[in-house]
Amino acid sequence: MAEPRRGDYIDGGQNGQGFVAAEKNGRWGKAVEVPGLAALNAGNAHFSSVSCASAGNCAADGSYGQPYGLGFVAAEKNGVWGKAISVPGLANLTGRLAEATSVSCASPGNCAAVGDYSNSSGGRTQGFVAVERNGRWGKAIEVPGLGPLNSRGGVYISEVSCAPAGACAAGGSYTDRHHHFQGFVVSQTG
């Protein structure tokens, strides 16, 4: 199976740009910039994660802007990367900064992306999830149930994993009312 990798580089204008490269049968292919990422990016783009449901059918996520201001997702179908897009609906949740931190695909065109964002009420950090169904990304929503737990406004979602049957789980940490970090997991089915 071709296994993509993600990374970053500094271009001639001293801006961070993101790239992907695929390995197949022990040989690495040419690194490419995901289409559309340069148009989104005002500098400092980086990939956070990549996940493949099958060879040539992958998704990647990360952040772009100054400094890492907005989250993006991109999908590869049959070996061709589609255009990188801002995570749909994320701008409605965030007041300032957002980052897509992890993506996982259950099957081609069916993925989940998670991350965190600073909301407009005092810069508190919250968690979001966005789901891709049949190749179309839905709007990002706040992770259900996380808001009341996160009384001090410090969420970090580190990972999401989706099984082939379509069930996903995500985990991370939040800051409780005593200023202690606590772990959490959340699951989604269907």
Predicted segments, located by residue:
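Residue-level hotspots at or immediately adjacent to binding/recognition sites across diverse folds
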Residues: 1-190
